[in-house]
Curated annotation (Swiss-Prot):
Its EC number is 1.14.14.5. It comes from the Bacteria. GO terms for biological process: alkanesulfonate catabolic process. It comes from Citrobacter koseri (strain ATCC BAA-895 / CDC 4225-83 / SGSC4696). Belongs to the SsuD family. Keywords: Flavoprotein, FMN, Monooxygenase, Oxidoreductase. This is Alkanesulfonate monooxygenase. GO terms for molecular function: alkanesulfonate monooxygenase activity. It catalyses: an alkanesulfonate + FMNH2 + O2 = an aldehyde + FMN + sulfite + H2O + 2 H(+). FMNH(2) which is absolutely required for this enzymatic reaction, is provided by SsuE. InterPro entries: Alkanesulphonate_mOase_FMN-dep (IPR019911), Luciferase-like_dom (IPR011251), Luciferase-like_sf (IPR036661), SsuD_RutA_monooxygenase (IPR050172).
Amino acid sequence: MSLNMFWFLPTHGDGHYLGTEAGSRPVDHGYLQQIAQTADRLGFTGVLIPTGRSCEDAWLVAASMIPVTQRLKFLVALRPSVTSPTVAARQAATLDRLSNGRALFNLVTGSDPQELAGDGVFLDHTERYEASSEFTQVWRRLLQGETVDFNGKHIHVRGAKLFFPAIQQPYPPLYFGGSSDVAQDLAAEQVDLYLTWGEPPAQVKEKIEQVRAKAAARGRKIRFGIRLHVIVRETNEEAWRAADRLIAHLDDDTIAKAQAAFARTDSVGQHRMAALHNGKRDQLEISPNLWAGVGLVRGGAGTALVGDGPTVAARINEYAALGIDSFVLSGYPHLEEAYNVGELLFPHLDVAIPEIPQPQPLHQQGEAVANEFIPRKAAQS
């Protein structure tokens, strides 16, 4: 099975070390463009663009990278409860059309009550997933060309429609990750690819089996992906030294503050990540070549595969054997580590190198009449 390898645009900051200004670098448009073009040339399928109050806006960043890349896809966040599903459907179709079918979407429900409150969202965990389910139903139906009336608990629309369809049909692929039962139910019902963070293989296997069974019970099949950091070097010893250097400037106070912030979230996945190390830095190799040091201060994905190319490739293939076909990777600094992955890891994997998409002809149509309907063809005399 050929593997889809994704990289990451660090719109929330980048550098040589975690938890310190030492070794950091400005993340401006030119730097993000460098990373995107490098990923494009090396053969990555796409890039994940993160979302949240600590990040640059993912949609604007993705749009700005379209003209400077050729085949790279953009995995961009959809934010239920923050954005209307009808507006999000128009945005998604436009991004897909402007990128010639290179748009992918990642459903993000949110987990930090403080951040959500700052965005005007005051739903609890279960309510957010209810709202996300309703959002996704409306979003998918619009992109499939329906005129939508929907009267849900959280979302109400009447006569919603999309004038400009996406290139990818029936709609651009929808990714999603979540570890709670309600999250897995949403994945089984509505998404195309279920993402998990990089837990040890036995735990990942259990989650995949749960989601696969739930999808099958609904008459659906679903793909799987995993989100991991990587530290790849020419030798295993060099890779582990690089891992140690990454957290060399971390002090106990910074770790404690980060763990306290993670503890206030209602994300089951985040709590599972934190439990891998319990905020302690003395036993961070939690599974062969799987290192939890990143999660001491970074929310979300908190583990890295560490080693030389053949070793990391072997670990990736262990995950692939569980049914995972997409790997969303990152590493510090993201420009240099992209080259390390492309040059030291890719030769040991069966990587699905994307082709440059051919331009897709768009439907010819005149300006909408009264913003209400597409004009008819002229009558033949």
